[in-house]
Amino acid sequence: MSASAAVATRHDWSLAEVRALFEQPFNDLLFQAQTVHRAYFDPNRVQVSTLLSIKTGACPEDCKYCPQSGHYNTGLDKEKLMEVQKVLEAAAEAKAIGSTRFCMGAAWKHPSAKDMPYVLEMVKGVKRLGLETCMTLGRLTQEQTQALADAGLDYYNHNLDTSPEFYGNIITTRTYGERLQTLAYVREAGMKICSGGILGMGESVDDRAGLLIQLANLPEHPESVPINMLVKVKGTPLAEEKDVDPFDFIRTLAVARIMMPKSHVRLSAGREQMNEQMQALAFMAGANSIFYGEKLLTTKNPQAEKDMQLFARLGIKPEEREEHADEVHQAAIEQALVEQRDSQLFYNAASA
C-alpha cells in the first residue's frame, strides 16, 4: 500500500474491508497502523486526560457492563451531583499533575433541567483553569447540547459501545439510534465528539469491526475514540465474561487508527489489567491518548507516577497545549477558584 493510500481519510468502509484489516498478520497490521499514525501525529506524544465522576451510581440504564447501573447490586455507594467548587478543585489538581483535558462524567440517562445550571458552571470554571473540557451526561436534547456548547464545552463523550447488531445484548434502556442522534446534536452545535466502545462483552470480531465502521462512517470522524477493555465488576451480568485476548485488543486499536487516521485513539478503561508490554504495544498500534490518575469513574486506573515512569522508559512525552507562563497560569487558577467559591450558583449535594 502506498503512503498516500495508507493515510487517506474515508467514510465508506465496508465490513469486508475491515475484516481484511483484522485478518492481517499481526506485524503487518501494526506496521500499517504505525505508518498511518506517523502521518498525522508525533509518535512519541500521548494526550493525557483526567476523568472525574461528578455524579455516581443509581443510573436508570441497564448497561450490563456498568457498576453504576441501579439495576445491579455492585456495592457502589450512590452519590449526588458534586458541588461545583469541589469539581474545580479536582480539575486544578489534574492540571498540576499534567493533564490537558478534564472529563466529567455523570451516571444519568439524561441530565435534568435542575442539574443543567450546575453542569454549565462546571464547564465554565474548568475552562477558566486553562484545561480542555469534556463531559459525558447521557442522552442530550438539542437545547441542552447548545447550552453546553455556549458554555464552552470542547468535547462530548457518548460511546456507541458495540455494533448495532450486538447492542441489544448489552443495553435495552436506550436505542442505538438515540446514541447516534446525540452525536449528531453535538456535531451540529460545533463541539468535538468523543465516542468509542468496549471490548470483552462477548462480541465477535465482526461486532468490533461493526463498531469501528459506525464511527468511521460518520460524516466527520470523532476527534477522540476511546477503546475500553471490559472491567469486570462483581454484581454486573458480565462479571464472569471471558477475558479479551491481548493481541485481539491491540488489533482493534490498530484498525481504529487506520480507519480514523486523524483521531486520537484513547487507551481507556482496563489499563489496570494491562502490563507494561501490552501498553507499549498499544502505543505502537497508534493509541495516543490515556486517562491519567487514580480512578476511571469507579474502577482503578494506573497511578499517575507509574504512567510517567512508563512514558520515560518508552521515550514518550505528554502532548502539550499552548500555556501561559507558570506564574500567570497559577494566578489564573487561584482567581477562578475564588470567583467560583463566591458564586451563588452552588450545588449543595447534602441538602438535595
Curated annotation (Swiss-Prot):
[2Fe-2S] cluster binds at C103, C134, C194, R266. [4Fe-4S] cluster binds at C59, C63, C66. Residues 44-262 form the Radical SAM core domain. Its cofactor is [4Fe-4S] cluster; [2Fe-2S] cluster. Its EC number is 2.8.1.6. Coiled coil: none annotated. NCBIfam families: bioB. Catalyzes the conversion of dethiobiotin (DTB) to biotin by the insertion of a sulfur atom into dethiobiotin via a radical-based mechanism. Homodimer. This is Biotin synthase. It comes from Pseudomonas paraeruginosa (strain DSM 24068 / PA7). The gene is bioB.
